[in-house]
Amino acid sequence: MPSARTVFRFFAGLLLAGHVVSAAAAELPAVFTRALKQAAIPLDHVAVVVQPLDADAPLISHHADAALNPASVMKLVTSFVALNQLGPNYVWKTDVWADGPIRDGVLEGDLVIKGHGDPGLTLERMWLLQRELRGRGIRHIHGNLVLDLSDFELPASDPGAFDGEPLALYNAAPGALVANFNATTLRLKPAGHAIEIEPEVALPGITIRSDIALTDDSACNGWKDALVPDIPDPGRKELVVAGHYPRGCGDQTLSLNLFEPAVTFDILFRGLWAETGGTLDGQTVPGMAPDTPPLVRFESPPLTNALTLLNKYSNNLMTRNLFLTLGAEAYGAPATLDKGARAVRADLTQRGISTRKLVLENGSGLSRIERISAGALNQLLRAAYRSPLFAEFEAALPIAATDGTLKRRFRGSPVAGKAHLKTGTLRDVSALAGYVDAADGRRVSVVMLVNHP
């Protein structure tokens, strides 16, 4: 039986071949309805809108007003509003203060860091931040590391609540200070009859124990699924990795969402600082930044960089931080989920995009309750096309069979290289929205949402 993904591929092929564009207005092509029937997907669980960008009315509009879960296609909404409200050159800032005198490379006092939600503070960029601190004369810190997280006000959350996978990176929580997408990366290496585990960056205060059984299998299939990482006692900060690992896999890396963002930031900051010869004597404590100009203001790459990463690679954490940033910029800090939702609704309403069926939780689509209609998504795609920022919006989308999440999808199909599409997948949800260059030369906006087991 064909899957929803197979149906999507088939539908995109129909678009490019012109079968959809030549269909009678508002009708689903018969070949497409047959494909849905073969996949056992009822028509009332599907919403489709197709409209040439130069046309005033859709060619196809099926259940366009139905409120359906869009999965990661919701990222288009957050991205569209971000370009409108923040602008393509918006940058996040991370501010650092030295709360004491600096003499002969020693800070006699606390180092205070205030995060404003930069979602792309990778290890490489954290190293650059630390290099700026060294440029200000700091190599040794005789004080605490003080983290100011006050720009974000978030409810307590369970990273495993969504699907029972708390260590999966896609479940990483947002935060005012986030390092390396909240990923702790481990290197796995067969050594004799065991597996050695080494962290990518030194992890001060973290114990790693390998209980992995090395097998003699030469094939390397599903090795990640065969591993069972666990933190038996979060208070001890001990990571135990059990399971089995085929010798044929050789060296591999495993990235995990082990701790809440502030803890991961602390661990990685200390690890990088120590690796480059620095020392930090004190504890890590929460606190408030002083009301004075920072010693270092470290800026992120522009918003367009973040939009490319979060759309092409469907990065949930980046999108959730962006959603919160929208709220803070519109209504003032601290950022909250409610402010983010209000900011998104206000922008869409201002641009004539329907919000009647819109339900927002975190703006990323990693949600069981988020909803939007295919008609509203089509309105958004058309509004983006008319915007002076369309080039930035479209460039952030995966290209069929070319890059991002679509690099291995639509290969060998007529749509390969001729569509910019955002897809989304959850349990019982498949979704697709974007732009296709049809066979007759017209550009077409297309939305397809399927909510069915």
Per-region residue spans from a language model:
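Sec-dependent signal peptide recognition
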Residues: R5-G13
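N-terminal signal peptide c-region/cleavage motif recognized by signal peptidases
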Residues: A17-V21
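Beta-lactamase-like hydrolase cores
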Residues: A23-D54, I60-A67, E132-R136
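Conserved serine DD-peptidase/penicillin-binding transpeptidase domain
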Residues: L28-L36, Q85-T355
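Short beta-strand scaffold segments in enzyme catalytic cores
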Residues: V48-V50, T94-V96, A433
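Residue-level preference for non-acidic, small/hydrophobic
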Residues: D56, K75-A82, L145, L177, ...
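Small-residue-rich helix-loop
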Residues: L59-S61, F323-P453
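Short active-site loop at a secondary-structure junction
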Residues: S61-V81
